[in-house]
């Protein structure tokens, strides 16, 4: 039976950033993931939503295409997104580059964000390496995801960065997602486990051996794993082209 997928953005309630956690994860050590970016987005319908992302160059953040909006503000160097620290760098996005063939709740869910100013690289703010174009990471690997998404479907929000280890699954585990494409996407999270990415985690990185291999894309509204992540390696030529031209 086909079940509708759910983009993993988080609606911001009462005009404030009320982000939560990854389901089944633990709180990250503060500033142990200096590449993490918290995105505050105003949509074309004037709604405020949140996504994750990650710094790949001092002036570029990589995220999911469904996190596009009328305006985007990026916070770097954050741990507790509701408690401002000296480590914070808040930067405006001046241009959004969603992949040209992006299909909502489908494939090509990847986007580059050009920052108005270059981030200052510090102990709390740094870049994350990307895989080469030829990389094809296979099922069975254990990887890590981090984000400020909810702890559960009905759980109260938390504000600190969370992380969880998730297994890369065989493509058949994502067969209930009609648009799933194993060549362009990753099936992430053991169906027998409760650990998963959820609302607010969209756009965050999947780390395998310290390299960003995927981007949180969509999952079931029940939060039951697995979820679908965009593979990064097939898009390296496009990423490199955008970075070179900007």
Swiss-Prot record:
The active site is at residues 66, 109, 202. GO terms for molecular function: serine-type endopeptidase activity. CDD domains: Tryp_SPc. Residues 20-21 form a propeptide. Residues 1-19 form the signal peptide. Its EC number is 3.4.21.-. Residues 22-244 form the Peptidase S1 domain. Glycans are attached at residue 120. It is found in: Secreted; Cytoplasmic granule. It comes from the Eukaryota. Keywords: Disulfide bond, Glycoprotein, Hydrolase, Protease, Secreted, Serine protease, Signal, Zymogen. GO terms for cellular component: cytoplasm; extracellular space; intracellular membrane-bounded organelle. InterPro entries: Peptidase_S1_PA, Peptidase_S1_PA_chymotrypsin, Peptidase_S1A, Trypsin_dom, TRYPSIN_HIS, TRYPSIN_SER. Disulfide bonds join 51-67, 143-208, 174-187. One of its GO terms (biological process) is proteolysis. Belongs to the peptidase S1 family. Granzyme subfamily. Putative mast cell chymase. This is Mast cell protease 2. It comes from Ovis aries (Sheep).
